[in-house]
Structure formats: C-alpha cells, structure tokens
C-alpha cells in the first residue's frame, strides 16, 4: 500500500462518523476538559468497572486514544473496538479506561512525535503533556485510581500506537504499560533513534500487534524496532509481539485482540 493512500485511509477512518445507534455500555460516561497545550476542549470517555459502584476498590488506569472508536458504534467510522462490552464480559482483572477523542483534522499533529516531510505533524509532546499534566491529575482526583507507574497504561493503534510507544520514553516514570497496535513507525524514522537517545524504564511492559495484510512496511518496521529495543536493554520478559496472519489495518483486528493484550498488560 502506498503511503498516500494509507494516510488517506487513516484520515477518513478517524474523521467521519457513522449514523448507527449507540452501543456504549451504561458503564461509559463522558466529560469535557480544557487542553491548553492544544488550544482546545477535549471530550473524554471513561469506562468504569462493574464493581466500581459497589466497592471502595482502587483500579489501574489505561489511557487510550481515538475514543470515538473505542466504545460506541455510533461515533466510529468503520466499527468500534468494543472495549466496554469486552470488559463487561470478563469480570476480572478490572481497570478504568480513559478514552481521549482525537482532534479530527489535528489528529496527525497530536499523535506524531516527529513531523513527516509531506504530511506535517510532530506535536505529540503537547498532546502527552495534556495527558500527564491535566488529564491524569483530574482522573486521579475524581476517580478511585491507582496512580502509580506500574498501574498506568497508554494504548492505541496506528498513529495512536506510535504515540503510545513514544510516551514510554517521554514519560518513563508515568506509563508502565504500553499497548502499541499497528504502530506507524514509517511516519518519521527518527523514532528508531529514540531507544538509543532516551532512557527507558526497564520495568515498562510493551505489547505490539500488527497484521500481515496491513501496509507493506508494517511487519518489517516492527521487527526492526524490536531489534533496536533489544540492543538497548529491553528484556524479553517485558514485551510481546504478535503478528496476525491475514490481519488488516482496521478496528476488527484491534478489537479481536484487545482482551488478550489487556490480560497480558495487567498480569502481575
């Protein structure tokens, strides 16, 4: 797949809403929070575990990108991840899921650490600063969260997979669990310098997933990155890479594998 058509797919898939009925669980609520770093107001989706209402338990928190596609078919373009239905069905382990809506036309800017010579972007530092300095303190103050590094994750797909990977190096004492699906490492190859130039917390857990029928760069790019990580000290115990035969770049791939990743990241 050529990069031009690939980027067009990304833009359309995350910028157009469908008109189907809402499928969001009753355990999902939303609120808005100012994001001064991005000069906008962000809509935030929060999934609370079933036991939240009847206990005083505290829970791990996973921050996820592209909230429009996580919980509700009505707000997604080509299908949802069904995060809420999946977690409602399993019981334990339980976690709070915080979804951050993407910025529409600004999505590329927000989710890319380095600019592309053609597609621009490169403002992920501002986006992550909003999560760490504004959103996370709000969540930790208003919900019964476990705020420490080992109980805080960040998770996304495509450009969301890229920025989740980047967050592990930008905030190595904040995010202990990284879910990186179909990461867009092709966007700027400076991302491969990151493990060499930035210190990684050795306890950080990474779960990577790609499909063999995504863009032609996806599988070799991930394999290259894993070799870079290994050379720079990442323990084999702290990462998992799954290559899905026939998997395509879409919500079906990511939804089908979400629970497996969730279990692995939360396993103590």
Task: Describe the function of each predicted region.
Residues 1-25:
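Bacterial Sec-dependent N-terminal signal peptides
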Residues 21-268:
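Non-catalytic cap/lid and distal C-terminal segments of serine-dependent acyl enzymes
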């Amino acid at each position: 797949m050529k990069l031009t058509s690939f980027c067009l797919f990304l833009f359309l898939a995350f910028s157009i809403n469908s008109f189907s009925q809402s499928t969001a669980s009753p355990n999902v609520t939303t609120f808005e929070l100012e994001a001064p770093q991005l000069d906008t107001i962000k809509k935030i989706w929060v999934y609370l575990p079933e036991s939240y209402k009847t206990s005083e338990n505290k829970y791990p928190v996973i921050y996820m990108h592209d909230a429009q596609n996580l919980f509700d078919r009505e707000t997604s373009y080509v299908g949802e991840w069904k995060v809420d239905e999946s977690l409602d069905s399993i019981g334990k382990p339980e976690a709070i899921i915080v979804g951050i809506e993407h910025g529409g036309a600004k999505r590329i800017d927000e989710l890319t650490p380095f600019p592309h010579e053609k597609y621009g972007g490169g403002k992920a530092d501002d986006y992550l600063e909003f999560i760490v300095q504004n959103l996370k303190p709000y969540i930790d103050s208003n919900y019964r969260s476990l705020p420490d590094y080992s109980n805080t994750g960040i998770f996304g797909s495509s450009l969301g997979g890229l920025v989740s990977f980047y967050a592990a190096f930008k905030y190595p004492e904040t995010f202990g669990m990284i879910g990186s699906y179909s990461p867009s490492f092709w966007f700027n190859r400076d991302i491969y310098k990151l493990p060499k130039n930035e210190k990684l917390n050795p306890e950080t857990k990474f779960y990577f997933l790609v499909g063999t029928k995504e863009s032609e760069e996806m599988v070799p790019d991930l394999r290259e990155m894993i070799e870079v990580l290994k050379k720079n000290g990442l323990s084999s115990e702290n990462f998992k890479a799954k290559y899905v035969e026939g998997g395509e770049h879409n919500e079906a791939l990511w939804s089908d594998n979400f629970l497996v990743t969730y279990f692995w990241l939360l396993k103590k």
